[in-house]
């Protein structure tokens, strides 16, 4: 059990530094390029572990599995993470971190809608409390920049959807979480690479360049911009945050259960703004602090509720 908590702590720190490191790298790379690099390298870094898990289970990847990975890659990497990346660029890292941490709440709602899983009373309360916390941070009445916030919410929503489809896929195809993640990242990166290629087609690039808001999506570079000064940060994002964060998260899940592993997303809303304050010197308003506290309370309700549910019902949980 001690090992599990070590995995949770490492994963939480890696994930909590995600928005900050992405913000720091944002100056040297295009957002979509950064997304492409981190999922390509992260996915490849997780691949040996995924292949090891497959050979241990005597499994092979079939064509129909590729369809699943292409779909999860599209939702997680192309849609969710692109919105997320642009959100980090236009908004405060701390705000994006907190809003994105609400993705397990959206996942709960989707699991109810798609997998027809029942929402326990504690989970329902957690959803409501967390949404209240989000509203306090977001404070819709004082919205100066609705763009960053809308993008963060879309990213969290679609990531919640991805985790449910991923869970459904791993249950149906019997892949473990790490295998699912590695192939999702690689397929998502390939899909992004295709879209990036399209952005180099002259007529399309010209059209995008004419709109100042869309000009950054024209001629998206693949590898240019990598220098000796930012290579370490880029490696940290690819291997630390993307491969390491997810890797340790799944290790925690495999040595314990889903609710313990998901502690990662519960500690993050509190830790990420503190790191943003220390590293990026972002000002954190009183309402943000209040919202963070409420979200953490909501997460605690969900975590404690899951704990009790596990004690009453010792059935093993499906992986996220």
Q: What is each residue range found by the language model?
A:
Residues 33-44, 84-118, 123-124, 155, ...:
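Specific alpha-helical transmembrane segments that line the substrate/conduction pathway
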Residues 39, 230, 262, 266-320:
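C-terminal-most transmembrane helix of multi-pass membrane proteins
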Residues 28-79, 106-107, 158-165, 182-203, ...:
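Transmembrane alpha-helices of multi-pass small-molecule transport proteins
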């Amino acid at each position: 059990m001690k090992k599990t908590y070590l995995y949770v702590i490492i994963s939480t720190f890696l994930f909590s530094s995600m928005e900050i490191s992405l913000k720091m790298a944002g100056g040297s790379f295009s957002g979509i390029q950064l997304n492409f690099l981190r999922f390509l390298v992260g996915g490849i870094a997780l691949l040996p572990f995924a292949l090891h898990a497959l050979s241990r289970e005597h499994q092979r990847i079939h064509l129909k599995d590729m369809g699943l990975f292409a779909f999860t890659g599209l939702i997680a990497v192309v849609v969710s993470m692109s919105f997320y990346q642009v959100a980090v660029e236009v908004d405060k890292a701390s705000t994006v971190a907190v809003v994105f941490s609400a993705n397990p709440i959206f996942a709960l709602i989707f699991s109810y809608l798609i997998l027809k899983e029942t929402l326990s009373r504690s989970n329902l309360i957690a959803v409501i409390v967390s949404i209240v916390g989000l509203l306090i941070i977001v404070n819709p009445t004082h919205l100066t920049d609705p763009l960053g916030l809308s993008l963060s919410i879309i990213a969290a929503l679609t990531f919640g959807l991805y985790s449910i489809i991923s869970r459904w896929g791993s249950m149906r195809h019997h892949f473990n979480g790490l295998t699912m993640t590695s192939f999702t990242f690689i397929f998502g990166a390939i899909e992004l690479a295709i879209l990036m290629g399209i952005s180099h087609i002259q007529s399309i690039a010209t059209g995008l360049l004419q709109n100042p808001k869309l000009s950054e999506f024209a001629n998206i570079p693949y590898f240019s911009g990598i220098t000796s000064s930012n290579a370490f940060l880029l490696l940290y994002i690819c291997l630390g945050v993307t491969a390491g964060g997810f890797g340790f998260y799944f290790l925690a899940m495999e040595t314990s259960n889903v609710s313990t592993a998901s502690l990662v997303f519960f500690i993050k809303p509190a830790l990420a703004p503190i790191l943003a304050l220390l590293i990026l010197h972002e000002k954190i308003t009183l309402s943000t602090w209040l919202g963070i506290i409420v979200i953490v309370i909501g997460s605690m309700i969900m975590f404690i509720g899951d704990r009790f549910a596990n004690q009453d019902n010792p059935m093993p949980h499906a992986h996220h």
